[in-house]
């Protein structure tokens, strides 16, 4: 159930469908990367999907592992598959808060992609 606007570092479960081509699909955990002020003002969230696979992202270094992070969510954060979602239009469930070190690593990976 969706309640309120999520914050940076929240791990949510939601459906990423519809998708096209190589975009990651289905219902899965995502990590919220956008700043709280942006989230609240727009109702939009920049999220990175979390998966157990992600071979290409692992090989290219565009992911952050949750292994050893102390989260109940397992897998890797796909920083090369970020997308904007409308938090007011999608149904989601809050799972947990990611450690700040994981969020910082994910933001660094996104910056590397954009620079």
Please place each PLM-identified region on the residue numbering.
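Conserved functional hotspots at enzyme active or ligand-binding sites that engage polyanionic ligands
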Residues: 1-115
């Amino acid at each position: 159930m969706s309640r309120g606007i999520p914050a940076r570092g929240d791990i949510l479960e939601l459906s990423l469908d519809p998708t096209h081509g190589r975009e990651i699909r289905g219902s899965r955990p995502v990590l919220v990367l956008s700043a709280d002020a942006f989230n609240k003002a727009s109702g939009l969230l920049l999220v990175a999907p979390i998966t157990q696979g992600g071979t290409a992202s692992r090989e290219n270094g565009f992911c952050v592992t949750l292994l050893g992070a102390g989260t109940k969510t397992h897998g890797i954060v796909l920083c090369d598959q970020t997308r904007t979602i409308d938090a007011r239009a999608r149904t989601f469930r809050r799972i947990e808060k990611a450690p700040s070190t994981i969020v910082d690593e994910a933001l660094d990976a996104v910056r590397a992609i954009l620079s």
